[in-house]
Amino acid sequence: IRPEGFTIPMEATRIHGISNQTAILKGVNIKKVLNEFMEDAGNSSLLIGHNLSFDKKIVGAELIRMGYLDTLKNKPSFCTMESTVDFCKISNYSGYGYKFPKLQELYRKLFGQNFGNEHDASADVAATFKCFWELKKQGTINPLTSNDDLPF
């Protein structure tokens, strides 16, 4: 995304590796990206993601900022982070209960190794996809009431 009206903070650059300068030079207009994303999301019957509620809030805020309706709010969705707390059983720092697993932690639990390029959008999508299908295959998750409801 090309920054328009904001600057990418250095802390964010350290996480995902995209500097403000790189985004200015190589980024795409956010309206174009949102239009493509919303068309794809509109053609799907289920949104799947890791920490999906965060992503839906960020995209929803951008939709509203651009003058669009936030139709993602009511879209059926499945979060691999929220649904695998008991599966991963990673102790919470407070000592009570379990914490939400990071995508890398879930991936390691399922496949015994890390995936590369953490915080790279394409790598995160691929890892989430792989985790979702492995969890479904194992019967660990049931994203809908019936597998017949899945569109794939």
Residue positions per predicted region:
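Short alpha-helix plus adjacent loop in nuclease-associated cores
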Residues: 77-98
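Ser/Thr-centric signal marking residues that sit
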Residues: 13, 80, 84, 128
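Acidic active-site catalytic centers that drive phospho-/nucleotidyl reactions
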Residues: 55, 79, 124
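Short, well-ordered alpha-helical segments in soluble proteins
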Residues: 63-67, 84, 88-91, 110-115, ...
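Residues on a specific face of well-ordered alpha-helices
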Residues: 82, 101-105, 130
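Conserved non-catalytic scaffold segment of RNase H-like nuclease domains
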Residues: 1-66, 71-73, 101-113, 119
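Active-site metal-coordination segments of metallo-dependent hydrolases
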Residues: 96, 117-122
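Acidic two-metal-ion nuclease catalytic site recognized across multiple nuclease folds
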Residues: 106-110, 122, 126-152
